[in-house]
Amino acid sequence: MNPSSSKKRPVLLADRDGTLIRDVPYLSRIEDVALLPGVAEAIARLNRAGIPVAIVTNQSGVARGYFPEEFVLETQARIMELLEAAGARVDAFYYCPHLEPGADLREGSGGLPHLLRACDCRKPAPGLLLRALSDLSGDPVRSAIVGDADRDMKAGEAAGCGWGYRILQDGERTEGRPRITLVRSFSEAVEIYLAGLSPEGKSGNGAGGR
């Protein structure tokens, strides 16, 4: 065994909107930030298990000119407050403010030219996930991505994550894929993920539930 690989650990990577908090299109008011049911409890379970949690989120509203980059950070601070009040925490936060050139913009909004560019961090590109795994000494094979969109699953696959949990919205129908489990909530994803990790130091090969 490679000695360096033995020091790596599983990491739970989570999308933000529609996964951890209520999905408000281009969220722009702090008062609209609300954790989804069961999220704080599920993150607290991960905390107790010693598994780092990182938020990885696309925030193209910055590039579109809908809200300033500072608001993304204010929103994260509010999420942290809500989690801490419930005895939970996230360990890291990563966001992509970019938007591909030529994308449709809201009428009257010219966007921010320096952010209208191709990048490696806008999901389904894996850049945010790779940064999180690197910063948190994550073992991709034992790590998981949880999100409510196919782009989250594709980013997880590209980053080498062993497991993906795709949250289905009410009435949504989609097909599962190898190593992708369809779930109804973040808390369900965490329950399956934790059940599949080996008990000794979370050193197994990933979560079951396929």
Q: Model-predicted segments: where are they?
A:
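Active-site neighborhood of HAD-like aspartate-dependent phosphohydrolases
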Residues: N2-A54
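Asp-based, Mg2+/Mn2+-dependent phosphohydrolase catalytic module
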Residues: N2-L12, E70-L73, A77-D91, E100-P101, ...
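Short, small-residue-rich loop/turn micro-motifs
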Residues: R16-G18, P97, L168
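Catalytic P-loop NTPase motifs of RecA-like helicase/translocase cores
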Residues: L20-R22, A63, D152-M153
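Residues that scaffold the ATP/ADP-binding catalytic core of kinase and kinase-like folds
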Residues: D23, G65, I192
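Short beta-strands and strand-loop turn motifs
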Residues: D23-V24, I55-S60, G147
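Short glycine-enriched, charge-decorated loop/helix-capping segments at active-site entrances
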Residues: Y26-A34, F67-E70, H114-A118
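Substrate-recognition element of Asp-dependent hydrolases with the DxDx(T/V) motif
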Residues: V39, I43-T75, A88-A103, G156
